[in-house]
Structure formats: C-alpha cells, structure tokens
C-alpha cells in the first residue's frame, strides 16, 4: 500500500553512536574529503557485526567506504535485538534493502576481517568460524568485497560469495 511505501521513504538516524548520529560533524568531514578529492576506506568493528557500506554526503557525493569486522567472541546486534536465528537472514535482507548505503551485513557469524591494500584496489575478506568453544572449527571464507581505488572509489564487485571448488 502507498502508506507503507511512504513510511519506508522517511529517513531517520538509526544508530546514533555511528556516522548517522553525528550529522553535522560527518558532513564537515565528508565536505573536506570532497574538496580535497580524497576517498577514504574506514575500518570499524565496534558493532561486533560484519558490514560494508558506502560513505556518502547528504548530497549523495561518495567519499569512501566503511568495512566493519565482526567480533570473534562478543555478541552483536542479533543478541542485543533478540533476533531469532531463523529470522536473521530476513533482517539482513531488510537492512541492506532499507539502508541505502549498506551493501552487506552479517548479523550472526563471528570472526575477523582481512583487508589487503594495493595502489589500485582494496580487497576485503571476512573470515568466520562456526565456533570458538572447541579446538576444532569450520572456517567460512566465502564473503569478500573489492573496491577500485580511483577517484570514484568504484566497487568492482558487489559483495559476493566467493566460488569454492
């Protein structure tokens, strides 16, 4: 229905302890980066979940990307919001659909982020483990994101699952 779509069009800060909670300061920083014609790659991890986001000004100017690692042992958003395990994928889909800048989120896997920088690109690989409670565990290395380091900071592959043999 139209009223449901209208509700989704309303933009409001959803995490006041992140970029959207510091609107004025963020816009000053983004404006400075735009004037200097600099693109940034921000590494984060305090949310304890894996994310990949575009960093864009209120005018839609892309100034960089943010790559966030999950925690290894601390709970993340899924725990704080009491999201049932069977609904996590639906929440992840909703987040990436409703939060325009968000390219990827993983609300339940624990692990770390490995980032490789070259003069041409940034390669981000999320490494997840299925448990930290046992000496034996399964490693999941299927999520990655690449960004070309040119003036547009163009993603060369949207967040994808790596093909495994």
What annotation goes with each model-predicted range?
Residues 1-165:
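Long, structured stretches of catalytic cores involved in phosphate-ester chemistry, encompassing
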């Amino acid at each position: 229905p139209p009223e449901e779509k209208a509700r989704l069009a309303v933009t409001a800060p959803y995490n006041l302890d992140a970029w959207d909670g510091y609107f004025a300061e963020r816009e000053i920083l983004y404006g400075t980066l735009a004037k200097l014609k600099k693109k940034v790659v921000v590494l984060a991890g305090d949310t304890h979940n894996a994310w990949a986001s575009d960093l864009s000004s209120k005018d839609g100017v892309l100034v960089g990307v943010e790559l966030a690692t999950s925690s290894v042992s601390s709970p993340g958003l899924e725990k704080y919001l009491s999201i049932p395990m069977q609904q996590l994928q639906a929440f992840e889909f909703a987040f990436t659909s409703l939060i325009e800048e968000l390219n990827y989120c993983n609300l339940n896997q624990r692990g770390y982020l490995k980032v490789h920088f070259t003069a041409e690109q940034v390669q981000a690989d999320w490494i997840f483990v299925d448990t930290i409670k046992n000496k034996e565990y399964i490693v999941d290395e299927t999520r990655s994101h690449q960004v070309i380091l040119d003036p547009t900071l163009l993603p060369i592959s949207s967040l994808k699952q790596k093909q495994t043999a």
